[in-house]
Swiss-Prot record:
The gene is pnp. It catalyses: RNA(n+1) + phosphate = RNA(n) + a ribonucleoside 5'-diphosphate. InterPro entries: ExoRNase_PH_dom1, ExoRNase_PH_dom2, ExoRNase_PH_dom2_sf, KH_dom, KH_dom_type_1, KH_dom_type_1_sf, NA-bd_OB-fold, PNPase. Its cofactor is Mg(2+). One of its GO terms (biological process) is RNA processing. This is Polyribonucleotide nucleotidyltransferase. The keyword 4Fe-4S does not apply. Keywords: Cytoplasm, Magnesium, Metal-binding, Nucleotidyltransferase, RNA-binding, Transferase. GO terms for cellular component: cytosol. HAMAP family: PNPase.
């Protein structure tokens, strides 16, 4: 592995790339440094291809070592365990960025590892990891001959910013990550605060121009001689025998509108012809016959769309499948909806909780609480397949994150709506675009739950089929169109603009004109879906569900937080137990009181107010005598606040014994006559007469 150390300037920030110093036994490796953030990326691959598979076995792992930020992991074992969701999402970004650049028939098991070794808390490790993956691949002997780069675009005060700092990202109206070669895009992921199509296109154009320079820089790096991947050559006699039967069957299959019926027809034919041909050609593998059959089906399906201008289910290119929307479908949940579009169906629920239900996110740089959560579940029965219910898949994490981005910017501020909100999307049926169904169902369920969201939100998945200079853009693609197409382009948003965007491209040569057309076509589709949703429910319910917790917010002086909590938590524990409520206190003095019963919440609020209110000199209070002493009596005028009634202040007449006037437990009116410098309260009964 040849040593080199070079740097490239990206919008005034230097990326320093070094290779040949560490991890030299890997097929390719490098470190990428920006500021004091350092990422090590390695790539290894088996020398021989896997047999009997029709996909590239690529695994990408992005991990953040806690020592990179000077931290020790929490938990009993004090070491990094399974990847956090954030790490999984970056792994997916890298995978989606580079996968389209591998040869179609490359089948060697390949693993890319990106490890964050140092993080300065300012510079983005994600962009460094994607750049490092490209360099490690490009300088290795793997058949990766076209380098890619990635750039993050933000928008603050109307100005586009290339690779904003982490602090700047929090202020940005746009979080756009774009990967691509010097000529074309390969991956796009974005979350936005209702930006227009024109604004999004402007950001994409800026990203494309920035990528070009980084890709040209990589071409100056020394690279090993590349492995040559040859297209498999099939037995010509076998291929002719298959084509003699399969061409007509494929033409019949691709026009069957129902997914299950089409799959049954084609799978039955495949099983029949495969068994017959394996007897005739015993030296051939079943996977070889499957590959030839799938290629025929692929060509016929694309020919139907590109040349005959007919979609496989008979729809027009911009036609959206039939939509049905229902809300309040589950009786006991806080909010629910059932969104169905064609053969894709999402059951979406909303659960409201108190601030203590917020998710604690322990990231490498910061720890914070997440008020809004969205979880996406994709069981096997959604596609009629058996599937073990194991850990959440990377795909489920990715789809849930996209739907969360789409809905995040319509959520009310925590200042206005203090509840923790959890959305769960259970996919009951799937034939394409289940993540966008989750967005639509999530919006409807939020309305049904009475969450004061800013507007309704919908999403649609777009597809592209391109052959030479000819192409068609499809609205609301099915699973088969996604599989056969050259692009999967998901766009979600409101009537004001885009809130989330995701694009995966399988081909090179995607032009700005195509992207612009796809954005405008997606806008028309989104508006159509919003019309269907608004016809069912156009605004949030005025009231929360009877089963949702009631919440009251109030603010107390910061110096009173200790008094509210009490010694060892005594006061707050008593309030919670007596009123069956939960109380959460922020450092600012903001107090959240939540409970199932409204009366309990109100009672707890009154108690908190009394406990934290200051006694006022000259004010008369109803009090309860708590303790008798020789020199006077102590009385509680407010919860947790006692004052002394000196024996001389018990009555207008001379008092020899305190017990002659008051006894423990008596309720008497008292007046605050003094609060001394130490905060001690002096009371008087005779002054209150």
């Amino acid at each position: 592995m040849e040593y080199f150390k070079k740097e490239v300037d990206v919008a005034g920030k230097k990326f320093i790339v070094e290779s040949g110093k560490v991890a030299k036994q890997a097929g390719g490796s490098c470190t990428v440094r920006i500021g004091e953030t350092v990422v090590l990326v390695t790539v290894v691959s088996l020398k021989e291809p896997k047999v009997g598979i029709d996909f590239m076995p690529l695994t990408v792992d992005y991990r953040e070592r806690t020592y990179a930020a000077g931290k020790i992991p929490g938990g009993f074992f004090k070491r990094e365990t399974r990847p956090r969701d954030g790490e999984v999402l970056v792994s997916r970004l890298i995978d989606r960025s580079i996968r389209p650049l591998f040869p179609e028939y490359y089948r060697n098991d390949t693993q890319i590892s990106a490890v964050v070794l140092s993080h300065d808390g300012e510079n983005d490790s994600e962009m460094a990891a994607i750049l490092g993956a490209s360099i490690a691949l490009y300088t290795s002997d793997l058949p990766f001959t076209t380098p890619i780069a990635s750039v993050r675009i933000g928008k603050i005060n109307g100005q586009l910013i290339i690779n904003p700092l982490i602090a700047e990202q929090k202020l940005s109206d746009l979080d756009l990550v774009v990967s691509g070669t010097e000529e074309a895009l390969t991956m796009v992921e974005a979350g936005a605060r209702e930006l227009s199509e024109a604004e999004m296109l402007e950001a994409l154009n800026l990203a494309g121009k920035t990528l070009k320079g980084i890709c040209l820089f990589q071409k100056t790096l020394p690279a090993k001689t590349k492995i040559v991947v040859e297209q498999p050559q099939h037995n010509s006699l076998l291929k002719a025998d298959i084509e003699a039967e399969a061409v007509s069957k494929a033409e019949m299959s691709v026009v069957i509108k129902e997914k299950c019926e089409r799959e049954f027809f084609w799978d039955s034919f495949k099983k029949d012809i495969s068994s017959r041909l394996l007897e005739k050609y015993p030296e051939e593998l079943p996977s070889t016959i499957d590959a030839i059959l799938e290629d025929i089906f692929y060509q016929k399906a694309r020919d139907l769309v590109l040349n005959k201008k007919i979609r496989t289910d008979g729809r027009g290119f911009e036609e959206i499948r039939p939509i049905t929307c229902e809300t309040g479908v589950l009786p006991r949940v806080h909010g629910s909806s059932l969104f169905t579009r064609g053969q894709t169906q999402a059951l979406v629920t909303v659960t409201l909780g108190s601030p203590c239900d917020m998710q604690v996110i322990d990231e490498l740089i910061v720890e914070y609480k997440e008020r809004f959560m969205l979880h996406y579940n994709f069981p096997g029965f959604a596609t009629g397949e058996p599937k073990r219910d194991r850990a959440v898949s990377r795909r489920e994490i990715g789809h849930g994150n996209l739907a969360k981005k789409a809905l995040k910017h319509i959520m009310p501020d925590g200042e206005d709506f203090g509840y923790a909100v959890r959305i769960v999307s259970d996919i009951l049926e799937s034939n394409g675009s289940s993540s966008m169904a989750s967005v639509c169902g999530g919006s409807l369920a939020l309305f049904n739950a009475g969450v004061p969201v800013k507007s309704s939100c919908a999403g649609v998945s777009m597809g592209l089929m391109k052959e030479g200079g000819s192409y068609v853009i499809l609205t609301d693609i099915t699973g088969m169109e996604d599989h056969l197409g050259d692009m999967d382009f998901k766009v979600a948003g409101t009537r004001k603009g885009i809130t989330a965007l995701q694009m995966d491209i399988k081909i090179l040569g995607l032009t700005t004109e195509i992207v612009a057309q796809a954005l405008e076509q997606a806008k028309r589709g989104r508006f159509f879906i919003l019309d269907q949703m608004d016809a069912v429910v156009s605004a949030p319910k005025n009231d929360l569900s009877n089963y949702a917790p009631r919440m009251i917010t109030l603010t107390i002086p910061q110096n009173k937080i200790g008094e509210l909590i009490g010694p060892g938590g005594k006061n707050i524990r008593k309030i919670q137990e007596d009123n069956n409520v939960k109380i959460d206190i922020e450092e600012t003095g903001r107090v959240f009181i939540s409970g199932v019963e409204s009366d309990g919440v109100k009672s707890a609020k009154e108690y908190v107010e009394c406990l934290t209110v200051e006694a006022e000199v000259g004010k008369i209070y109803k009090s309860r005598v708590t303790k008798i002493m020789a020199f006077g009596a102590f009385a509680e005028i407010l919860p947790g606040k006692e004052g002394l009634i000196h024996i001389s202040q018990l009555s207008n007449r001379h008092t020899k014994r305190v017990e002659d006037v008051v006894k423990e437990g008596d309720e008497v009116k008292v007046k605050v006559i003094e609060i001394d410098k130490q905060g001690r309260i002096n009371l008087s009964i005779k002054a209150a007469l």
